[in-house]
Amino acid sequence: VKILLAVESGSRAWGFASPDSDYDVRFIYVRPKEDYLRLENVRDVIELPIDDVLDINGWDLQKTLRLLYKSNPTLFEWFSSPIVYLETDFADRFRKIMGEYFSTKKSLYHYISMAEGNYREYLKTEMVRAKKYFYVLRPVLTCRWILERGTPPPMLFRDCLLYTSPSP
C-alpha cells in the first residue's frame, strides 16, 4: 500500500497527553489498482496489534471517500491533526474539498454521543484521573465550536477552549 497521510489522533493530538499516553497513529492509504478491480470485497482497514506504546490503524482511500460523503467527524479530525507524520499532496487537495461535506448536525450528534459515553465510562467511578475529565470536556467544547462557527472544530483542546464564547 501507499500511505497518503499519517497523523496523530487522541490525547497527544488534542494537547493533553500524559506520560503514559500511547501513540494513536492514523493513516489513509491507497492499495494497488488491481485491488479496486476485484469482484470480491477487499478489507478496507489496516489495524496493527495494539500495545502499550502504539495504536496504529488506517483507512483505504475508498473508505475515506465514503466517510467524507457521510461527513464523518473522525475523518475531519485526522485532517486537522497538529501532529503529522507523513503527508502527500493528496492531503492538501483533499482538505480543499472537505468543507463541502461538513455537516453540523452529524458532528453535533457525534460529539454529544462521545461526551455522554466518556462521562459514563470515565467519570462515574470512585477514582477519576484528571485526564479523563478532558475526555468529556473536549467533545463538549467542540459542540460549542460547531454551534458558534458552523465549521469543523480544531483538534487542540486549548484552541477549542480559547476560541469559543464563555457560558453566559
Describe the residue ranges of each PLM region.
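Conserved small/polar residues in nucleotide/adenosyl-binding loops
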Residues: 163-168
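Helical scaffold of the NTase/Pol beta-like nucleotidyltransferase catalytic core
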Residues: 1-7
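Short, solvent-exposed loop/turn segments at secondary-structure junctions
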Residues: 11-14, 31-33, 120, 141-142, ...
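Catalytic metal-binding acidic patch
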Residues: 10-51
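Short His-Asn-centered micro-motif
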Residues: 8-10, 57
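Short, charged amphipathic alpha-helical segments flanked by flexible coils
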Residues: 152-162
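Conserved NTP/Mg2+-binding pocket subregion across the NTase superfamily
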Residues: 47-144, 148-149, 161
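Residue-level detector of short, conserved catalytic/binding motifs and their immediate flanks
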Residues: 4, 23, 134
